[in-house]
Amino acid sequence: GIDPNYRTSRQVVGEHQGHKVYGPVDPPKVLGIHGTIVXVDFDLCIADG
């Protein structure tokens, strides 16, 4: 799952459509964690609902 401390343990590396992106990011394979209040780890998410 997502590291519950990602906001302090990871660095903000950019923004995407108005929300923060926490790194590391190295597209196309490593996409980081998107969001601050509700976050999605794009490296763990398989978009199944």
From Swiss-Prot:
Residues the entry annotates as binding Zn(2+): 16, 19, 34
Cofactor note: Binds 1 [3Fe-4S] cluster.
Span list, region Ferredoxin: 37-49
Keywords noted in UniProt: 3Fe-4S, 4Fe-4S, Electron transport, Iron, Iron-sulfur, Metal-binding, Methylation, Repeat, Transport, Zinc
Modified residues annotated as N6-methyllysine in this record: 29
Gene3D superfamilies the UniProt entry points to: 3.30.70.20
Region (N-terminal extension): 1-36
Cofactor requirement: [3Fe-4S] cluster; [4Fe-4S] cluster; Zn(2+)
MF annotations from Gene Ontology: 3 iron, 4 sulfur cluster binding; 4 iron, 4 sulfur cluster binding; metal ion binding
Amino-acid positions noted as binding [3Fe-4S] cluster in the UniProt annotation, renumbered to this chain: 45
Function of the protein: Ferredoxins are iron-sulfur proteins that transfer electrons in a wide variety of metabolic reactions.
Name used for this protein in its record: Zinc-containing ferredoxin
Organism of derivation: Acidianus infernus
Encoding gene per record: zfx
